[in-house]
Amino acid sequence: MKIKYDIKLMHFMSLFAKITHASLKDCFLDKYNLLTFIVNENEIGKAIGKKGFKVKLLEKSMNRKIKIVEFNPDMLSFTKNIIYPLKTRSVEGNEKNIIIEAIDSKTRGLLIGRGAENLRNYESIVKRYFDINEIRVN
C-alpha cells in the first residue's frame, strides 16, 4: 500500500522530529481525527520525554491530541502497542488473523467500541504495515 502525505501532515512530522529528536516511521490522522505518530523501535522513550513532557509540548504546539506508538516488526507486539493503555490477557494470531483476549467486559467494550468502530480503527492501522484479514476480540 502506497502512503501519501499532505502538507499539513508533513508539517506535523517536521515539528515532531524537531521537538523529540526521535526517528519517525509514519504519521497519520485516524478515524477520530487523532494524530498518531509511529516511531521506530526503542525510540518511544525519546519521543515521550520525561513525565510526558514532549507529548504535552507537542499537543500544545499542534493544538490537538496526539498518540505515539512504537513500531515493532512482530505483528502481535505491534498490535499490543496500538491498543495500549488497554490491558489484555493475550494477543494471539496467525499470519492473517489477530485474536485479542480482553481481561474483563469493560475492556472488551472499549476495544470493540460502538458498532465495532474502535476495532476497525485498530485493524486499519495494523493493515498499513501487515497483511491481515481481521482483528477479533474474545
For the regions a language model picked out, list residue spans one by one:
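RNA-contacting regions in translation and RNA-metabolism proteins
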Residues: 1-138
